[in-house]
Amino acid sequence: GSEAIDAAMRAMLDPGDEVLIPQPSYVSYVPCAVLAGGVPVVIELKAENEFRLTAEELEAAITPKTKLLVLPFPNNPTGAIMEKSDLEKIAEVIKKHDIFVLSDEIYSELTYLEKHVTIASLPGMWERTIVINGFSKSHAMTGWRLGYACGPRVIIEQMLKIHQFAIMCAPSTSQYAGVEALKNGDEDVAQMREEYNGRRRYLLHRFKEMGLSCFEPFGAFYVFPCISEFGMTSEQFATELLNKEKLALVPGTAFGDCGEGYLRVSYAYSLENLKEAMNRMEAFITGLRKQGEKQA
């Protein structure tokens, strides 16, 4: 998936083309756009919209230089999803301005509200959408480095040229594993989705008990709690948490400036480990609040 993002941008962008990148989001989009000669334009997503991209936000960011929108849903780090009704509104703006979409759907099998809908399936969108996906998240095959891209032949053919000269091909062993996953892995994916959903609900329950503000994510395997009440930056909070409780979480700012005041919490761990992590998190937060009461 990661290489496909790079190849797609190299194939599609001319120097100076603007790439719209909603944030918080995966860290590779901005550098890939720059390496391809593009100009990244960040759209800051808002917690009050559950970190979804709205048609109004998209419309406001488009200029005559806009070539491509990156659509990173289900989202890393927020866990946000785009429902079909959201995508339909986005699609109308895309068609109106005649731009392309790079839809990163690597977490498409991990949704907990409704089945994932790809924007490429909407009327008039297939010919202007590159869909990126892979096996790392859906089938827990992160180390196999196997992904794929779907889209209009004219773009895929150019991506293939870049791919051939960059790494030649994915390892044959990974490709055989991918075929096996597609043929016989559906039951495993469903079981994993159910397990993740239980962990997701557990984390949300614990954060509520701690009194932390946290919107409910319905995709991927991340929760994005707000820690702004403590008067610390996300990086300061994460660093102190690591030093005092030996618990490592990722500052929201790792995924864009608008991630300030948030932390990314992954639940791609056993429930036993998550319980221990939440106990340490609660102890840390309790200490901060007691410290604040003394200073007040």
Where are these regions (language model features)?
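PLP-dependent class I/II
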Residues: S2-A296
